[in-house]
Amino acid sequence: MSFEKERAEAIALVEEALEDFDIDATRAEINSFVDAYTADTINDLELVDIAEAYRNFTDDE
């Protein structure tokens, strides 16, 4: 899978996870999270794990 396609898939998963768990985030925050955690890592996670990782990511900032 190309980098762009993998990244787009990760962004879509993050958006879905955040929506499912009522977490607000801007596009810039989502992009920063995907860059930090890497798309291939995010694409291997369940939505609940993505939401938890995002919460931890924003708590660290």
Segment roles from a protein language model:
Residues 24-61:
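Short, charge-rich amphipathic interface segments used for partner binding and complex assembly
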Residues 1-27:
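N-terminal acidic leader/helix
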